[in-house]
Amino acid sequence: MTQSFKTPTQTPLLGLSLAKLTEWVQQQGQPAYRGKQLYQWIYQKGAKSLADITVFSKQWREEISNFPIGRSVIHHRSVAPDATVKYLLKLSDGNIIETVGIPTYKRLTVCVSSQVGCPMACDFCATGKGGFSRNLEAHEIIDQVLTVQEDFERRVSHIVFMGMGEPLLNTKNVLAAVRSLNQDLGIGQRLITISTSGIRDRIRQLAQHKLQVTLAVSLHASNQRLREHLIPSAKFYPLADLISECREYVKITKRRISFEYILLASFNDLPDHARELAKNMRGFQCHVNLIPYNPISEVDYQRPTQEMIKTFANALAEQNIAVSIRYSRGLEANAACGQLRASRV
């Protein structure tokens, strides 16, 4: 079925493939080669509007100037001492989302949002405290990556869907964005991580696409009781069922799963918790990523001591579970894991 482009508000051009952009320019009465030019200006030269594309005639630029590419505006930008940058991006409808650029010597990672706000309301996370507005469209996800790439003036190498929102409650647009980021920006699927708190049947559905992305499951607890306290939706999705679905995912995709585990002092950080967690991890390809808690003002959780963090990690390692400790970047800019919310810092 041929996609129609009759009105300026119908389809932002960002996210469309070369073939679709070629179709679009032909529908506007232009030769097919203009499609490649448009593609290059959108994905490689960072055009914010069609009026920016100087290889097009002035007359045609004026005729198509109201058709949206689909770019956001940087509403606010804050930089942490470790060079991590947090962006508040203003969307076309006025909503604000957060994106984080995390540079190292060899990498530039972008932490992207998949929703405006988050409906999951995890007890330790700032994003859920602000409520939920809507899903992001695919072009609004792609735009976040382009924004960071242009601001840093270097190529993005890795993408993590660990910003605002639950990606598997917006699977259609997240997968469309992943395909475009892979095909149009040249970012390998294995360098893209999709994080989820665990939505019944969605991990199984994701497995059917047989993507080479990394799946990160936010577990955060070693048993059902603790998990229900941290993640309200866990009441409707028993831990045993979630682990079973994760095992099925690994079997189908042949890809290792990463389990994210936020360490909260005197709540889920004891060696007994580690041993209980290990029982769930045996028998399939997985890795546990420990995240020392990053404080937010709304709750009273505390970060464990360095000694407790290492003790927990060692307890997992003794059970032959692959484990690492992730010390979040951007803490001073409120850009670390669990701190994202659409507000200035």
Swiss-Prot record:
Q: Which reaction does it catalyse?
A: adenosine(2503) in 23S rRNA + 2 reduced [2Fe-2S]-[ferredoxin] + 2 S-adenosyl-L-methionine = 2-methyladenosine(2503) in 23S rRNA + 5'-deoxyadenosine + L-methionine + 2 oxidized [2Fe-2S]-[ferredoxin] + S-adenosyl-L-homocysteine; adenosine(37) in tRNA + 2 reduced [2Fe-2S]-[ferredoxin] + 2 S-adenosyl-L-methionine = 2-methyladenosine(37) in tRNA + 5'-deoxyadenosine + L-methionine + 2 oxidized [2Fe-2S]-[ferredoxin] + S-adenosyl-L-homocysteine
A single GO BP = tRNA methylation
Return the SUPFAM superfamilies for the record. Radical SAM enzymes (SSF102114)
Q: Which residues bind S-adenosyl-L-methionine?
A: 165-166, 195, 218-220, 294
For the keyword tRNA processing, the answer is yes
Which UniProt keywords are present, listed alphabetically?
4Fe-4S, Cytoplasm, Disulfide bond, Iron, Iron-sulfur, Metal-binding, Methyltransferase, rRNA processing, S-adenosyl-L-methionine, Transferase, tRNA processing
Annotated positions binding [4Fe-4S] cluster: 118, 122, 125
**Every Radical SAM core domain range:** 104-332
Needs which cofactor? Answer: [4Fe-4S] cluster
Q: Name one GO molecular function term.
A: tRNA (adenine(37)-C2)-methyltransferase activity
PROSITE patterns named in the record: RADICAL_SAM
Q: Looking at the keywords, is Lipid metabolism present?
A: no
Q: Which residues form the active site?
A: 98, 337
Which cysteines in this chain are paired by disulphide bridges? 111-337
The UniProt family comment states:
Belongs to the radical SAM superfamily. RlmN family.
User: Any other comment in the entry?
Assistant: Reaction proceeds by a ping-pong mechanism involving intermediate methylation of a conserved cysteine residue.
PANTHER family named among the record's database cross-references: 23S RRNA METHYLTRANSFERASE, RADICAL SAM CORE DOMAIN-CONTAINING PROTEIN
Protein name per its UniProtKB record:
Probable dual-specificity RNA methyltransferase RlmN
The scientific name of the source species is Trichodesmium erythraeum (strain IMS101)
